[in-house]
Amino acid sequence: MNTQIIQLEDTKLEVNNLNFHYGDFHALKNINMRIAKHKVTAFIGPSGCGKSTLLRSFNRIFELYPNQYATGEIKLDGENLLTSPMDISLIRAKVGMVFQKPTPFPMSIYDNVAFGIRLFEKLSKADLNDRVEWALSKAALWNEVKDKLNQSGDSLSGGQQQRLCIARGIAIKPEVLLLDEPCSALDPISTAKIEELISELKHDYTVVMVTHNMQQAARCSDYTAFMYLGELIEFDETAKIFDKPRLQRTEDYIKGRMG
């Protein structure tokens, strides 16, 4: 049941026999899947099903916490990220992440976006300015903040802060962008802007998102994975998952007959 290999034109991430443990708790069980390049893939399922755990495995963010470990393979363009000798900061630069709650750094709007660029690249001031403008434009925020770049990121609204975090994430030009319930703390208007942005971002990045909002998954994603109790139950094109799922358990969840 946890092997969901669908035919893709171009695979960006390949997950093979992935297991994850929180101490003695077996949170992910033999996950196998392929994530399509330049598409949006959504993970859905009830709370505690493992969707955020799976997402956070992709850039090894779990290593920041004790007694958590993953086994198996998560391959980015063929390289297993779980065993790669690459510096972990470079892995997280390639596989960026935006969290559920907007987390602007305690610094100016400009410095929030420039922060990662300064860590990984040596750019002239002019090139840095261009990159900051580019990232804010990509995040559909430039026109709203271009005259107040020196103001604190905390001065922005919640929706603007989340777009600032997305700008910060894409400023270092990752290959994959992970979004962990990016709209759950936002109002409907801000949510609509983020959803529109997600649809644009896939032209440049491979986007993987976790959402509790099934309508959001249906609107934004190209592929959807349904998870339950640490298992990958069904994974297919989003239209197929929502219109004609293969499994009864998937249909029950989609139609609200299970929590």
From Swiss-Prot:
Gene3D superfamilies: P-loop containing nucleotide triphosphate hydrolases
Amino-acid positions noted as binding ATP in the UniProt annotation, renumbered to this chain: 45-52
Protein origin, superkingdom: Bacteria
Pfam families on file: ABC_tran
GO cellular component terms listed in the entry, alphabetical order: plasma membrane
Keyword ATP-binding: yes
Main location: membrane
Enzyme class: translocase
Biological processes, Gene Ontology terms: phosphate ion transmembrane transport
Location of the ABC transporter domain: 13-254
Keyword Isomerase: no
Membrane topology (UniProt): Peripheral membrane protein
EC numbers, comma separated: 7.3.2.1
UniProt catalytic activity: phosphate(out) + ATP + H2O = ADP + 2 phosphate(in) + H(+)
Entries under SMART domains matching the protein: AAA
Record's subcellular location: Cell inner membrane
Keywords: ATP-binding, Cell inner membrane, Cell membrane, Membrane, Nucleotide-binding, Phosphate transport, Translocase, Transport
Any one GO MF annotation of this record: ATPase-coupled phosphate ion transmembrane transporter activity
PROSITE patterns in UniProt: ABC_TRANSPORTER_1, ABC_TRANSPORTER_2, PSTB
PANTHER family cross-referenced by the UniProt entry: ABC TRANSPORTER I FAMILY MEMBER 17, PHOSPHATE IMPORT ATP-BINDING PROTEIN PSTB
Family as reported in the entry's similarity comment: Belongs to the ABC transporter superfamily. Phosphate importer (TC 3.A.1.7) family.
Subunit text: The complex is composed of two ATP-binding proteins (PstB), two transmembrane proteins (PstC and PstA) and a solute-binding protein (PstS).
The name this protein goes by in its record: Phosphate import ATP-binding protein PstB
Source species of the chain: Pasteurella multocida (strain Pm70)
Gene from which this protein is expressed: pstB
